[in-house]
């Protein structure tokens, strides 16, 4: 049966892949981003991540919400400023909070729904220079597990925590064969992430309520967070 989903940050690499997968399955997928996106009649340009409750044109109920926006702001503690932390929190955590709160009435309609947040392996493994993004995504993971408890049994809430992924946002970390090889070598499976494989896990989690999955963080990191090999 066709479902109705919303992808926030759909013009991200992972968001595009999830959109493609869900659309191919015959679902109605609404999208938002700060720029244009090829989804006629169902795309909304959102400059303000705090105004989801004011969005017009969405259906009365949603079966799933995916929040994709993220940042990569790598700085040492000596260089980090409060403004850096606030900027990362605004995109990675506060935006997700506003999305869930604003859209919750739609997610709780009818049979309930599933929510997926994208976090990072750095929320689970200590990494140099990741203080700001780790703090922001850790806040999101803590929020997600709390919401999983609070919103049960109507809404399932889960996270996906990728490692370094080959996307335009991470290009500065992967712009040479030497950097790519070094990144792969840090992972037990000797692979870095790619948007397609991450999107396939997210596609499953967009139906998480149907499968009895909630309150979980799925580490898609080639073993980096749990294995020493």
Residue spans for each PLM region:
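N-terminal Rossmann NAD(P)H-binding glycine-rich loop of SDR-like oxidoreductase domains
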Residues: 11, 15-19
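Alpha-helical segment proximal to the catalytic Tyr-Lys
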Residues: 105, 148-153, 211
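A conserved structural motif in NAD(P)-dependent oxidoreductases
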Residues: 187-198
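Substrate-binding pocket helix/loop in short-chain dehydrogenase/reductase
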Residues: 76-77, 81-89, 183
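Catalytic loop of short-chain dehydrogenase/reductase
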Residues: 114-139, 144-152, 164-165
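Short C-terminal tail/terminal secondary-structure segment
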Residues: 214-229
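Short, flexible catalytic-loop segment of classical short-chain dehydrogenase/reductase
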Residues: 161-172
């Amino acid at each position: 049966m066709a479902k109705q989903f919303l992808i926030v940050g759909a013009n991200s690499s992972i968001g595009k892949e999830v959109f493609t997968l869900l659309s191919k399955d015959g679902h109605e997928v609404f999208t938002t981003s700060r720029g244009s996106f090829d989804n006629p009649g169902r795309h909304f340009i959102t400059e303000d991540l705090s105004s989801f409750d004011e969005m017009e044109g969405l259906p009365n109920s949603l079966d799933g919400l995916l929040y994709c926006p993220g940042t990569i702001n790598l700085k040492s503690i000596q260089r980090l400023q409060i403004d850096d932390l606030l900027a990362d929190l605004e995109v990675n955590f506060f935006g997700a909070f506003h999305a869930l709160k604003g859209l919750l009435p739609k997610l709780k309609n009818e049979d309930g729904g599933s929510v997926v947040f994208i976090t990072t392996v750095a929320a689970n493994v200590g990494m140099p220079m990741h203080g700001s993004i780790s703090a922001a995504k850790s806040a999101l993971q803590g929020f997600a597990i709390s919401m999983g408890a609070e919103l049960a049994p109507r809404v399932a809430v889960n996270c996906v925590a990728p490692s370094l992924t080959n996307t335009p946002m991470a290009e500065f970390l992967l712009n040479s064969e030497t950097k790519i090889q070094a990144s792969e070598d840090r992972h037990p499976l000797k692979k870095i992430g790619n948007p397609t494989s991450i999107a396939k896990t997210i596609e499953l989690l967009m139906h998480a309520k149907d499968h009895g999955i909630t309150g979980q963080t799925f580490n898609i990191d080639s073993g980096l967070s749990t294995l020493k090999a």
